Amino acid sequence: VAAAAYGTDTITKADKIVGPGNIFVATAKKLCYGVVDIDMIAGPSEILIVADENANPKYIAADLMSQAEHDKLASAILITTSKELVKNVDKELVRQVEDLPRKDIIKSSLDNYGGAVIVDSIKEGINLSNKIAPEHLEVLVDNPLEQLPNIKNAGSIFLGEYTPEPLGDYMSGTNHVLPTGGTAKFYSALGVYDFIKHSAFSYYPQAVLGT
C-alpha cells in the first residue's frame, strides 16, 4: 500500500487506492490518505437482517454465519418482530455451525458481535436499521419490495429470502466493496463514480467584467 501511495523506483505512484482488505490493509490506507485518495476505510464485515414472523430460521442462521465466518470482529444482527423466530434461529445456529470449517471464528464473532433485537413492527425495525447503517442488509418480510423506499442507510440491500447476501459477493454483480461501521450514512458502494472527478471553470470577457 505504501509503495503504491508514495511510489518507488519500480512502482509508479498511484492517484487512488481502492478495494477491501484486513485490518492491516485498512490501517495502511488510512495512514496514506491525503498522499493518495482512497475509497473508504472498510471492515470488519457486517450483516443485519430485518425479518418478520414468517421468515425461515434456517436461512437466517446461514446468512448470519455467511458474514460471521469472515472475521472474529465481524458483526451479525437480527432484528425481528417475533420472539419465536429468535429462538428458532438460535437453535439453527447451534446446529449448523458444527458442520462448518470456520466454526471457531463464527462462534467468536457471534459471541462478541452477534445479537437479536425484538421490535414491535417492521417499520420500527427498518428505522433502527437506518440508524445502524449496516454494510449488508437483508429484508426477509412479506412483500419486501414495499420496504425499499423506507431504507435510507445500507451499503447493499438484499430483498426476500431467495436473495441471500453471498449473492452480492459472488454472483449478482453488485459491488461488494461497501461502507461499514455506520458509514453507509454518507458513503456508497465502490462504483464508477469513485473514478470520476470534475473541475469548476470560469470565463469572463472584458465586456461582462467591465474595466
Predicted regions and their residues:
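Short loop-to-beta-strand entry elements in the cores of soluble alpha/beta enzymes
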Residues: 18-20, 40-51, 67-90, 106-117, ...
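A short, aliphatic-rich alpha-helical micro-motif
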Residues: 11, 110-111, 151-152
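Aromatic-enriched alpha-helical interface/lid elements that frame and gate functional surfaces
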Residues: 95-109
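Short, solvent-exposed amphipathic alpha-helical segments in soluble enzyme
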Residues: 9, 32-35, 63-68, 92-96, ...
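Conserved NAD(P)+-binding/catalytic subdomain of aldehyde/semialdehyde dehydrogenases
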Residues: 1-66, 70-75
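General structural feature for long, well-ordered alpha-helical segments within catalytic domains
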Residues: 13, 20, 24, 28, ...
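Short acidic-hydrophobic, aromatic-tinged amphipathic segments that line or gate anion-handling sites
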Residues: 1, 116-121
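C-terminal core of ALDH-fold dehydrogenases
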Residues: 122, 130-211
